[in-house]
């Protein structure tokens, strides 16, 4: 089987694509799989790191506002449609699968025009713009939440699959757990809290953790904290203001991004983060308690909906973004 997977932007779009690719390879070792992305997103790091080839095209998210900048992006995205078509003619895929990001518009549309079967995965309970716009052109839409099915209009076929995840549950022995903690720079003496605002980082969460460090509230636990690559220098500057060196915070390991997330999530006792569909699914699969701070101002407030799925089974506590402080989080 020859497969193209379109995924771009954030880890929440890219990791489901990698999970699908890994499963295809597991079932059919001779499969040929390539990814299509942009030159700007996290796919440039995560896809090659997972062992897959990445082809890049021009693609941009467009706003409703009429502006010179938007017109330029529209022109580049039209170019991307042609670039995607060229890749498909050369690679000759049996199927094209989109797992999120504005890259899906050009790739799914190109595949449809060439008569190539298509699939699109929607992670959230409230379908995004890409799914709504591409519903007629997509042969099968896969959804993570059953509630999403009636919200997708004019689709040929909608199937409830759940979210494809890379992270699996492991029952580590004491020695293995201690090895992982030691590599992180922590130990087995205190509980471990994982803090991550997703691949883009979360400013409000980062500010709360800086407050905890500044006031030395972290006496009863250790922490591994992923700030997000774009916010690492901001956090470093905030800590510098309090004469705290980012690499010398007792009991807290601070990183831009965590690449061995499967190991870290398995050894962590509690997870703190946003409530994207991928994050919520991974936490549920691992059976870990969590504190979730849903991202506000997203379409249909879908992160709050995601978080409530875990809250309703007493697996998570929700703190609203506007109510978040270091003191409240520490409590």
Which residues does each predicted region cover?
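Acidic donor-binding loop of glycosyltransferase active sites
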Residues: 93-95, 258, 262-281, 288
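Glycosyltransferases and closely related glycan-assembly transferases
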Residues: 83-96, 104-119, 132-140
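Short alpha-helix at the nucleotide-sugar/activated-sugar donor binding site of glycosyltransferases
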Residues: 112, 135, 265, 283-284, ...
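Short amphipathic alpha-helix
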Residues: 13-24
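Active-site-proximal region of nucleotide-activated glycan assembly enzymes
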Residues: 2, 42, 53, 112-178, ...
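Donor-nucleotide binding loops and adjacent catalytic segments primarily
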Residues: 41, 46, 175-270, 304-307, ...
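Structural loop-to-beta junction motif characteristic of Rossmann-like glycosyltransferase folds
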Residues: 52, 116-117, 269-270, 287-295, ...
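Conserved nucleotide-sugar phosphate-binding/catalytic loop shared by glycosyltransferases and other
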Residues: 3-8, 27-76, 81, 161, ...
């Amino acid at each position: 089987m020859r497969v193209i997977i379109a995924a771009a932007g954030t880890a929440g779009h890219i990791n489901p694509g990698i999970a699908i690719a890994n499963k295809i390879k597991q079932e059919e070792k001779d499969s040929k799989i390539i990814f299509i992305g942009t030159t700007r997103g996290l796919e440039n790091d995560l896809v090659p790191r997972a062992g897959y080839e990445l082809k890049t095209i021009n693609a941009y998210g467009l706003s409703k506002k009429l502006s010179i900048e938007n017109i330029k992006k529209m022109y580049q995205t039209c170019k991307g449609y042609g670039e995607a078509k060229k890749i498909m003619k050369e690679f000759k895929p049996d199927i094209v699968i989109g797992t999120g990001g504005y890259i899906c518009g050009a790739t799914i549309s190109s595949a449809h025009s060439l008569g190539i079967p298509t699939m699109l995965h929607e992670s959230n309970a409230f379908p995004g713009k890409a799914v709504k716009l591409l519903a007629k052109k997509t042969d099968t839409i896969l959804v993570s939440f059953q509630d999403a099915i009636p919200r997708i209009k004019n689709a040929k076929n909608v199937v409830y699959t759940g979210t494809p995840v890379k992270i699996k549950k492991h029952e580590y022995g004491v020695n293995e757990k201690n090895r992982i903690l030691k590599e992180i720079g922590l130990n087995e003496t205190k509980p471990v809290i994982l803090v991550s605002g997703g691949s883009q980082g979360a400013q409000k969460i980062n500010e709360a953790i800086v407050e905890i460090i500044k006031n030395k509230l972290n006496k009863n636990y250790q922490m591994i904290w992923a700030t997000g690559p774009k916010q690492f220098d901001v956090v470093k500057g905030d800590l510098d203001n309090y004469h705290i060196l980012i690499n010398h915070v007792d009991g807290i390991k601070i990183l831009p991004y965590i690449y061995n997330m499967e190991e870290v999530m398995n050894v962590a006792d509690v997870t703190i983060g946003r409530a994207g569909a991928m994050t919520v699914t991974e936490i549920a699969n691992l059976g870990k308690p969590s504190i979730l701070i849903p991202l506000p101002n997203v379409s249909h407030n879908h992160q709050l909906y995601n978080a409530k799925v875990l809250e309703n089974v007493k697996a998570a506590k929700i703190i609203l973004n506007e109510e978040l402080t270091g003191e409240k989080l520490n409590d």
